[in-house]
């Protein structure tokens, strides 16, 4: 990594995706291998520049992934229901300080600090095996590697993370059941009872 970082620092021009991936590598190494990464960590001004580039090209509402209509309804329903469950402001497609995008964020009203992130697993975050020999019926989907890494990084930075699948959300019958489920999910993620309605 040291040689790659030094080569990239000296390169006059790089592709946008390369810069975004370099920032993702930096964030992951800083979160999980700070002891080894410290020796050849990028300069702070380079990190700031990469973060700005990353936020511009990969995060927030301007770059939100387009969901299918039925999936979009689930995300909206989760966000709307959260407003009746927790004291705070609910944001869809929120961009974190690190530049990473999350499905739903609940922030404190006054300080705007994050209470919790809620991720909704569906076709945009899950994948199924393409192996024709694998059993398809009842075969569990897997979370995409990039989505899983993003969640690990955010948790490592101290953010509370709650995840719900679209299928589970659709199986909840009424509004009360959905609110109770979200309350329990947020409580398990570490949100204090005082913040829950």
What are these model-derived regions, one by one?
Residues 1-197:
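Eukaryotic RNA-binding helical-repeat scaffolds
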């Amino acid at each position: 990594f040291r040689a790659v970082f030094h080569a990239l620092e000296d390169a006059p021009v790089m592709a946008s995706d390369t810069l975004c991936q370099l920032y993702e590598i930096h964030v992951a190494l800083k979160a999980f291998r700070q002891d080894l990464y410290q020796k050849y960590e990028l300069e702070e001004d380079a990190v700031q520049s990469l973060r700005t580039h990353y936020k511009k090209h990969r995060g927030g509402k301007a770059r939100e992934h387009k969901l299918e209509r039925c999936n979009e309804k689930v995300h909206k329903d989760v966000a709307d229901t959260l407003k009746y469950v927790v004291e705070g402001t609910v944001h869809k497609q929120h961009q974190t300080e690190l530049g990473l995008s999350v499905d739903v964020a609940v922030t404190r009203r006054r300080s705007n600090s994050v209470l919790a992130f809620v991720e909704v697993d569906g076709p945009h975050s899950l994948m199924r095996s393409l192996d024709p020999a694998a059993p398809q019926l009842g075969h569990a989907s897997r979370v995409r590697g990039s989505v899983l890494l993003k969640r690990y990084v955010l948790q490592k930075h101290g953010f509370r993370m709650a995840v719900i699948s679209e299928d589970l959300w659709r199986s909840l019958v009424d509004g009360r059941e959905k609110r109770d489920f979200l309350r329990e999910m947020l409580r398990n993620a570490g949100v204090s009872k005082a913040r829950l309605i």
